[in-house]
Amino acid sequence: MKTTNDFPTINERPPEGRKDDGSSFRVLVVDDSMFVAKQLGQILSSEGYEIVATAADGKEGVDKYKELCPNVDLVTMDNTMPKMDGITALEQIMAIDKNAKVVMVSALGKEELVKKSLMTGAKSYIIKPLDRKKVLERIAKVLQ
């Protein structure tokens, strides 16, 4: 005999880091700061996101995106990195996949840099230091 507890509630939905089918959103984290990459990874994985790879510079990030595409749902991208900056990496990722979902994560919050990132194809911009609530809200909104 079924009880009312056997049925999902109307407001029941998957955790933020999971798709409707229950699988995890897959994230590529690109940041030259190992501390920030680890912190971002912990925030996201604690909510069900799967960190599929990390990269320490823009060139490595683009290479990993090419390797993993289409199995990446989201890229987080720092702006200031060695070898290749975040805007250049963003341009290259958008050339590979015009539907790529990239969120810039940077200590630089200058208005012109934010605008350039968004005009280049970034879906959102998060300013460091990382605030757990803001990170999760922005990323969830991009993945809706």
Regions found by a protein language model. Name each.
Residues D57-E60, D85-T88:
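Acidic catalytic/metal-coordinating carboxylates
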